[in-house]
Amino acid sequence: VLSPADKTNVKAAWGKVGGHAGEYGAEALERMFLSFPTTKTYFPHFDLSHGSAQVKGHGKKVADALTLAVDHVDDMPQALSALSDLHAHKLRVDPVNFKLLSHCLLVTLAAHLPAEFTPAVHASLDKFLASVGTVLTSKYR
């Protein structure tokens, strides 16, 4: 459960991401594909090379979903309901992949926002991303 301090930290950190959200989302996906090659199996139709338009496009979708989650942090299940349905019923993404992408996103944010990425912010973002993952996998049951 996110504390009020966690919510404040997440909103402040995501605010610093600003117009780079899509870029950071794509970078996190690239990190995931390189570090965890089995995740590529969900994207057989994508050009997964560095800087590809498809990876950039999906990175923007990831970032937009996270922005939606930040904006609706008190009601993520409702805000992410359609996305949860998509991943559970149509795409059938293995839930472990949300943890892998979350890790890669944390690394990406730490690399780009070193001053903001304090231990407290790191912990808050980690809890937030775990909450997003829980919401996205809630309809698997």
UniProtKB/Swiss-Prot annotation:
Modified residues (Phosphothreonine): T8, T108, T134, T137
CDD domains: Hb-alpha-like
A family per Pfam: Globin
UniProt-listed PROSITE patterns: GLOBIN
Phosphoserine PTM sites in chain numbering: S3, S35, S49, S102, S124, S131, S138
CC terms in the record's Gene Ontology section: blood microparticle; haptoglobin-hemoglobin complex; hemoglobin complex
Tissue specificity: Red blood cells.
PTM sites of type N6-succinyllysine: K7, K11, K16, K40
GO BP: hydrogen peroxide catabolic process
Binding-site residues, heme b: H87
Modified residues (Phosphotyrosine): Y24
SUPFAM superfamilies on file: Globin-like
Presence of keyword Amino-acid biosynthesis: no
GO MF annotations, alphabetized: haptoglobin binding; heme binding; iron ion binding; organic acid binding; oxygen binding; oxygen carrier activity; peroxidase activity
Alphabetical keyword list: Acetylation, Heme, Iron, Metal-binding, Oxygen transport, Phosphoprotein, Transport
Domain of life per record: Eukaryota
N6-acetyllysine modified-residue sites: K16
Residues the record lists as binding O2: H58
Domain Globin: residue ranges: 1-141
Keyword Metal-binding set for record: yes
Function statement: Involved in oxygen transport from the lung to the various peripheral tissues.
Assembly information from the UniProt record: Heterotetramer of two alpha chains and two beta chains.
Family membership: Belongs to the globin family.
The protein's name: Hemoglobin subunit alpha-1/2/3
UniProt organism field: Macaca nemestrina
